[in-house]
Amino acid sequence: MKKFKCVVCGYIYTGEDAPEKCPVCGAGKDKFVEVKDEGEGWADEHKIGIAKGVDKEVLEGLRANFTGECTEVGMYLAMARQADREGYPEVAEAYKRIAFEEAEHASKFAELLGEVVVADTKTNLQMRVDAEKGACEGKKELATLAKKLNYDAIHDTVHEMCKDEARHGSAFRGLLNRYFK
């Protein structure tokens, strides 16, 4: 038995010859092609790092946009917190929604660049475990310095973020161990 695919709607038919008419979309026999490879290939998909080797100005623009989008995420979330403090919850929610959209933009620039993400989940998890450990240590040092200089509010905020980084790293390590070790 052979398999035939309707190129209009994707319907797969199994038989000796393509059907006269697609039972799903009604396309004629001429719209069927024989399926030769049964692999899981897709017609197209997103690829990480497609900007490698592009024009220097384009590459710099992609990097600048990635940084800008990341900055906007933090800025908009901070603005959302301020709007909440002032009693404007709808404004806060708009900032949060837009921050998420900016995060999506940043993720697309990250994928194009392929510098902070690779096409391998195990490697990405390990990179994040290592990065969160470094971020935790860096924030702990900053919090300790702020405490030493009697900047209590800065110490408290940064120290709490230090603990968040440890939690993030532990979550990533748990996933790494569960799926890859």
From Swiss-Prot:
Q: What induces it?
A: Up-regulated by heat and oxidative stress (exposure to air, O(2) and H(2)O(2)) (at mRNA and protein levels). Various other environmental stress conditions such as an increase of the pH of the growth medium from 4.5 to 6.2, addition of the salt NaCl or of the solvent butanol, and lowering the incubation temperature also result in transiently increased transcript levels. Is also expressed under non-stressful conditions. Repressed by PerR.
For the protein in the UniProt heading, the enzyme class is: oxidoreductase
Query: What cofactors are annotated for this protein?
Result: Fe(3+)
List each copy of the Rubredoxin-like domain by range. Answer: 1-35
SUPFAM superfamilies, per database record: Ferritin-like, Rubredoxin-like
Quote the cofactor binding remark. Binds 3 Fe(3+) ions per subunit.
Q: Where does Fe cation 1 bind?
A: C6, C9, C22, C25
Quickly give the catalysed reaction. H2O2 + NADH + H(+) = NAD(+) + 2 H2O
Question: Could you cite one Gene Ontology molecular function of this protein?
Answer: NADH peroxidase activity
The processes (GO biological process) annotated in the record are: cellular response to alkaline pH; cellular response to cold; cellular response to heat; cellular response to hydrogen peroxide; cellular response to oxygen levels; cellular response to salt stress; hydrogen peroxide catabolic process
| InterPro entries reported for this sequence | Anaerobic_Peroxidase-Rel (IPR052773), Ferritin-like (IPR012347), Ferritin-like_diiron (IPR009040), Ferritin-like_SF (IPR009078), RevRr_diiron-bd_dom (IPR045236), Rr_diiron-bd_dom (IPR003251), Rubredoxin-like_dom (IPR024934), RUBY_RBDX (IPR048574)
Asked if the keyword Iron belongs to this entry, the reply reads yes
The protein's UniProt keywords, in alphabetical order, are: Detoxification, Electron transport, Iron, Metal-binding, NAD, Oxidoreductase, Peroxidase, Stress response, Transport
Q: How does it assemble?
A: Homotetramer.
- State any further remark: This protein has been named 'reverse' rubrerythrin (revRbr) because the order of the two functional domains is reversed compared to 'classical' rubrerythrins: the rubredoxin-like FeS4 domain is located at the N-terminus and the ferritin-like diiron domain at the C-terminus.
- UniProt-recorded name of the protein: Reverse rubrerythrin-2
Taxonomic classification, please?
Answer: Bacteria, Bacillati, Bacillota, Clostridia, Eubacteriales
